[in-house]
Amino acid sequence: MKTFQLGFVGMALLAAACGANGADSSSSTGSDEAITDDHVGTALRVTQTNLVSDQPGVAVTTDPNAVNVWGISFNPAGPAWVSNNGTGTTEVITPVGADVLTVTVPVPTYVQADAGVSSTPTGQVFNGSATDFGGDKFIFVTEDGTISGWQPSTGAVLHDDYSSIGAVFKGVGLGPSMIYVADFHNDVIDVFDSTYKQISVAGGFEHPALPKGYAPFNVFVNGTQVFVAYAKQDKEKHDDAKGYGNGYVDLFDTAGNFEARLVSRGVLDSPWGMAIAPASFGKLAGALLVGNTGNGFIHAFTLSEGGYGGTTATYAGYLADTKGKELFIDNLWGLAVSPAPDQNRLYFSAGPESESHGLYGRLDVPGDFDAGQ
C-alpha cells in the first residue's frame, strides 16, 4: 500500500513561495487581473532522485551528453527518450538512469555536416502508429526550426526545415494523425499531417487576445484535449522573458478550436512542462501539473467540465520537497508520467545554471518506488 505525505500550506507559506510580488494562481475564469494569495492548496511532498547529469556527483549516472535536458517521451513498452538541447542528441534512459542508446538529431540543411554544429532539440513525441509519419516511432522538433523522425531502420531523418523563416520550435504534441508544433518566434501553432506536410485546421489555434509579446511555448495533448502554454518573448523572440506572472495556459480541441483560458498569469513563470498527475499523487491525482521554467516550481490545477463556462481550472496546490518547502528545480523543462507498469512515476528534465548543464530525474511520493526495478 502506497503512503502519501500530504500537508496543507498556510497563506504565509504560499506567499513566500510565490515571491515578493505575492502572485498566486489565476481563478478558474482565466482573468488577467492580478491574483492575491487567497488560494491555499495542497503541498504534496515528493522525493527527488537525480538519474542523469553532465556534472559528476550530481546524479546516479554522469553523461557528458546531458546538457540542457529538455523533451521527454515514452514508448509504452520501453524506457524514456530524453532530448539534450545542448548537445543535439536524444538518449534512451532506463528507470534507474542507465543510457542504452544515443541518437543524433539532424541539423538544418544549411549547416554543413563537418561544421561542428549540433542541433537544438526541444520537445518530442512517441508515435504508436505503424503507418503515420512513415512509421517513425519518435518525432523531434528543434529551436533550429526543424522536424525529424526516428525509426530503427533509418535512424533520425530530417523531414521539415523552417529555419529559413526563423522558426523556433519549442514544443510538440501528437494529435490524431497530426502533430502540433509551437513556433515561439513566429507566435503560431503549426500543424503537420501524418506525411509531415503542413496543414490548416478548422480552429487555427486562434485564441482571445494575449498581451503583446506572448507566444506558444509548448503543447501537451491528453486525449482530445490540447493544452497550450504561452510565455513572454524576449527582444529577439527566441527565448522566454522570465518573471512572476509571465504565462498563460489555454485549452483547445484537436481541431484547434479554442475552448477555455485555464490559467492566467498568477503563479506562472514561463510555463513549459505539463502532465496529468498520476494516481500516487493523492489529493493532486488527476490534476494538470504545470512546471515553470522561470522559477523552477510545479503547480497543480484541478480541471472541471460542464456548465455554461465549459472547462475550468482551479488552483489545487504545488509539489514540495521532503521538508515541505516548495520544490525548486533550476531551469525546469519537461514533465512526463511513465507508462504502465510504472505509471505512478513523474519524470522531469532541466537545464541548470542558465542551460549550461543538464539534469534528468524522477519525483516520487515517498515509498512509491522500488530502486531495484
Map each language-model feature to its residues:
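Sequence/structural signature of beta-propeller domains
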Residues: 20-24, 30-373
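Bacterial N-terminal signal peptides that target proteins for export
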Residues: 1-8
